């Protein structure tokens, strides 16, 4: 059970990082 929780947290962290990366690229392309 604890392992599943860690996996879910890792997936959320990964999505969060991808989101930040995507926004960063989007702002870079504006200028």
Curated annotation (Swiss-Prot):
Keywords: Amino-acid biosynthesis, Branched-chain amino acid biosynthesis, Leader peptide, Leucine biosynthesis, Plasmid. The keyword Amino-acid biosynthesis applies. GO terms for biological process: L-leucine biosynthetic process. The keyword Amino-acid biosynthesis applies. Involved in control of the biosynthesis of leucine. This is leu operon leader peptide. It comes from Buchnera aphidicola subsp. Rhopalosiphum padi.
């Amino acid at each position: 059970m604890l392992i599943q929780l860690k996996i879910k947290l890792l997936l959320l962290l990964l999505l969060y990082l991808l989101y930040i990366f995507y926004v960063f690229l989007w702002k870079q392309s504006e200028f």
